[in-house]
């Protein structure tokens, strides 16, 4: 930490992706994360990260950026036709009504029953260059280009946007996810199933209420 506003880190950890992925599994509203999260999240990776946090005239601002290897946990070999790619990720969050009680913007239910409305709106953009896995940091390895195949080196752009509102026990949460690519997402190998990058869009919405007696 440089001061109360700046922080840098190096190693393997969660990327600054969609909020539901970053929230701990013990602090979710429901028993499991959504299908949208499972398909489009950017999970963990190895690299550098930087954080900036500040409050300006009562409005909270959180900025995060990361440069990572793009292969996720337990990365596969970096040699061969798919070597050399990196993942570049940035996230911004604005809290127009100020900070949540007890860091409540990163647990889903309003268990602390906010006395005034609290809102956090965030967006992440991530570019994964020369992906090796079907979901970037997750999934099985893609087949590599060869002289006898039409397989391409695949790079993707992922947009993740979310919003969390809490007030007096009520918690409303929504997410939008999109992943696209200019490359052919399908890779092939003789006599085995195709492997392809998951592209497309997804939306999730959820709500909960914590009674005062809880």
What do the PLM-derived regions correspond to, one by one?
Residues 1-73, 79-99, 117-120, 125-127, ...:
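Outer membrane beta-barrel
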């Amino acid at each position: 930490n440089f001061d109360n506003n700046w922080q840098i880190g190096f190693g393997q950890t969660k990327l600054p992706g969609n909020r539901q992925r970053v929230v701990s599994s013990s602090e979710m509203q429901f028993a499991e994360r959504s299908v949208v999260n499972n398909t489009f999240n950017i999970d963990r990776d190895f690299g550098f990260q930087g954080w900036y946090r500040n409050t300006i005239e009562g409005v909270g601002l959180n900025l995060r950026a990361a440069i990572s290897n793009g292969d996720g946990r337990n990365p596969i070999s970096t040699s061969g036709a798919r070597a050399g790619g990196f993942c570049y990720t940035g996230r911004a969050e604005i809290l127009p009504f100020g900070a949540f009680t007890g860091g409540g913007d990163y647990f889903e239910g309003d268990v602390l029953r906010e006395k005034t409305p609290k809102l956090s709106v965030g967006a992440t953009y991530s570019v994964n260059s020369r992906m090796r896995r079907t979901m970037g940091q997750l999934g099985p390895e893609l087949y590599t280009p060869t002289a006898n195949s039409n397989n391409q080196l695949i790079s993707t752009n992922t947009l993740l946007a979310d919003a969390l509102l809490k007030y007096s026990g009520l918690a409303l949460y929504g997410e939008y996810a999109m992943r696209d690519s200019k490359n052919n997402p399908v890779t092939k190998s003789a006599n085995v199933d195709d492997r392809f990058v998951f592209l497309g869009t997804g939306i999730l919405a959820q709500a909960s209420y914590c009674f005062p007696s809880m």
